[in-house]
Amino acid sequence: MKRTLSLLAICTGAILSAPSYAACDLGDLEAEGKISLLSNSYPVLKHFSDKMKECEASKLEIKNKLVGGSAVQEQARIVLSSRRGNSPYDVIQVSAQSYHEFLLKEQIQPITDLVEKYWDEYNLADIPPSIWDLARHGGEIYALPIQLNMQEFFYRQDLFDQHNLEVPHTYQEVVTTGQALQKAGIDYPLSQAMGKGWNLATEFTNIYLSLGGQYFDEDGKPLFDGEKGVEAANILKSLLPLMSPNALSLSNDLVMVNFQQDKAAMGNVWATRASEMDNDQVSKVVGKVNYSMAPTANKNTTIPATSIFWDGYVFPHRLNSDRELVFKIMMESMSKENMKEGAELAFLSRQSANQVEGEQYRYLGALAEMIERGAKPFPSEGYYGLAHTEIGNKLPDALRGRTSIEVALNEAAEGYYKEARAQGYID
């Protein structure tokens, strides 16, 4: 099977990868000191981190810290907000969400001069302008895009075939399909990350965007507690009978394990988890999981209930090391050859890396299709993270029936507005 994936109008995401077929070449730069990276730990980013370490030399140590879940962004906030000396990390991996937050707070530095200097040497034109635009602000480039990531629909092809089921295209169809699987003896057919906090707020965002919802008005005042917000939350609530009793504590890692251990039949899952479905060292379902577009919120919309998410590498405003050396190391880890090697793990930013063959790349087709169908980017307002936090913390009680959805969303909106004013985002 061959996938030739156009980046089309990917006005939202990417991946600058990291393996290397040749030794790391730092040219005539003085390779000494210690370079450190703070990054998330999921497979594709660990892959890049490992390739960075190939640049170590007798006088150059590369010490990377990989942490799970949203902890990387929490640690980055602490590091970047500190006014005491230089950052302990030379490179920090950011998400689409945290990038805009750090940019507005002027905590990261532009790297336009280095991008231009090494443009030809590393064939950076291979990354489309729409991808570079993600990292551009006021004419300056502030990040090296790493990858495009989206949640897509994972499903057990063998179980769907066995029970003559069609892949659901709306969340109502997900519920109907789940009920059919339950009748067939599968108690908890659905698994997706709906744990309190970041994960649940992300699922809410996916459905809210599919409904055409806008988070804020032009002045930054909240809109997510309106009719579409209530509908999005009710759709989430309708999924709980299909999920295990610990549904509201499920993380992305736990969802991945559920699929690997034959405890899930379907769910909206991050595309970067797809390669682990076929990892025969840990998975019991090798070759059995297939991929489709994320379902839409309802039959009246064609927008997939997902968010185009991107990750990138940024340099702290107060950088301790030689910034050109740090940049060169990142370029070596993101070479054309390295990105091609990493295509199995994620959707890469270089156009040349997206012509791939093999069943291990079968998850990529759904990503391209969702982009064509109008999938929305993750909200980019610098203050969006405040709303995300409030929703993730307030909504679980409503989904458990301890309060109404309307009350929970109103409280989240009030909490967001108060904090956004306190931090000076809005008047």
Label for each model-derived stretch:
Residues 54-127, 162-169, 258, 265-266, ...:
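Extracytoplasmic "Venus flytrap"/periplasmic binding protein-like
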Residues 177-184, 219-248:
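Glycine-centered hinge/linker elements that transmit conformational signals in sensory
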Residues 79-82, 87-90, 120-158, 188, ...:
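A structural signal for short loop-to-beta-strand junctions that line the ligand-binding cleft
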